[in-house]
Each structure stands twice: as C-alpha cells, then as structure tokens.
Curated annotation (Swiss-Prot):
Family (UniProt): Belongs to the methyltransferase superfamily. L-isoaspartyl/D-aspartyl protein methyltransferase family.
Taxon lineage: Bacteria, Pseudomonadati, Pseudomonadota, Gammaproteobacteria, Lysobacterales
Gene Ontology CC terms, in alphabetical order: cytoplasm
Superkingdom to which the source organism belongs: Bacteria
HAMAP family membership: PIMT
Enzyme class: transferase
Protein's recorded name: Protein-L-isoaspartate O-methyltransferase
Keyword terms: Cytoplasm, Methyltransferase, S-adenosyl-L-methionine, Transferase
GO molecular function, one term: protein-L-isoaspartate (D-aspartate) O-methyltransferase activity
Length: 225
C-alpha cells in the first residue's frame, strides 16, 4: 500500500520542514520498531508541519507530541505510526477515527488510500482540520460530535482508531467494529495508560492485548464550538 497524497509545493517544506528532515524522522521510527513500510512512507509524505502552529514548525519532525490548543496535542509520530501499523494488519477499507484533533492521524490514514471518517468534539479544531484536508486535496469525512458515540450510520468499520484515553474501551465503539475488524485505543487514567488492540473475530468473539505504554489526553464527552 503506497501513499497517494499529491502535495502542493507549500507542503513540501524547506529547512527544518524539508524532506531530509522527514527522512530522519522515518529513520528514528524504524529504529524504534516501526516495520511497516507503507506506514513509514505515509509518515514521510504527510507534511506534519502543516498540522501545527507555525511557531512550532521547526519541531514538527521531532518524535514528540506538541500542543495544538484547547488543551489538546498532536500525537507523537511514533504513536501515530504504531496505531496505523496495527490497523493496516487487518487490511481495512473503511476506518473511523475518534478525536480528529489537528487532523494529522486522519491524514496519514487518508494518504494510504483508506476511506476515513473522523469525529471531533471541539468545533474550532475540526474547522482547522477541514481546511488542512482541503489544502491537501484529501477526501476525509468529518463530523462535529461527541466522539464517544462514534458514527454508527457509516458503520460497521473495518478499523477504529481512538486518539484520547478512556478508563476502559467504549462499548458503543466496539459495537461499530465489523467482524474481522480491529480497534486501537489508549486505555487508562492520567497516571498510567496502555495502547490496547481489540480484534473482533469472525465468530463474534473479542480478543485484546496491550501494544505499548502511552500518554494521551482524556476522552471527554459532549461538544464545544
């Protein structure tokens, strides 16, 4: 699976946002255990510097989370890559993301040619993400809503990616997962979280295991404009 993103010249970047800098990030991710080449290529292609404030652009290709306002962050590239790599293992076509945030995770999935649906509870963040998707020519379906309820009318989904942590996996989201599908989500409280992978088998059974320790902002209910 190869990235399908056609970038405008301004997305290519110069200096601290150049292709050479992105290649170094990909090398670090590979050294940190990311092995799926499609995932690494998507990380290389998607311009992370366009998903953060211009003042932080020089840090865009560091392997670290960065603030995006409203108490939210753009996830660490390793975490984005690990979640992407995990869901690609089930060869999904339709993916639900809970928590659009900056839009970066959705863009990585979209660059891989997946049909992406993403839900965000904070209206201002979603409006900014939509502008980025349009600028990159990405056809990502977006919705301003409480992410904890998912997007049932477009389900079931082959994969679900949750980008904020809840004390336990959300049953409503599990119900929107197709047979043979995979959900990846951070689970835990402020002091300790784990990235959990849940698989719904063809016989309807559920199997889950922990991928890695992580740190995410909390998954909140309700909506903000």
């Amino acid at each position: 699976m190869s990235p399908r993103l056609r970038l405008q010249p301004e997305a290519v970047g110069i200096g601290m946002t150049s292709q050479r800098v992105r290649d170094r990030l990909v090398d670090r991710l590979r050294e940190a255990g990311i092995v799926d080449e499609s995932t690494l290529n998507a990380i290389r292609v998607v311009p992370r510097h366009l998903f953060i404030d211009e003042a932080l652009a020089s840090r865009a290709y560091e392997d670290t989370a960065l603030p995006i306002g409203h108490g939210q962050t753009i996830s660490q590239p390793w975490v984005v890559a690990r979640m992407t790599e995990a869901v690609l293992q089930v060869a999904p076509k339709r993916v639900l993301e809970v928590g659009t945030g900056s839009g970066y995770q959705a863009a990585v999935l979209g660059a891989l040619g997946l049909e992406v649906y993403t839900v965000e509870r904070i209206g201002d963040l979603l409006r900014q993400a939509r502008k980025r998707f349009r600028a990159l020519g990405m056809n990502i379906r977006t919705k301003h809503d409480d992410g904890r309820v998912g997007w049932a009318e477009h389900g079931p989904f082959d994969a679900i990616v949750v980008t904020a942590a809840a004390p336990a996996l959300v049953d409503v989201l599990i119900e929107q997962l197709a047979e043979g599908g995979r959900l990846v989500a951070p689970v835990g409280g402020p002091s300790a979280q784990s990235l959990v992978q849940l698989d719904r088998r063809a016989d309807g059974s559920i199997e889950q295991h922990v991928l890695a320790p992580v740190t995410f902002v909390p998954l909140l209910s309700g909506m903000l404009d």
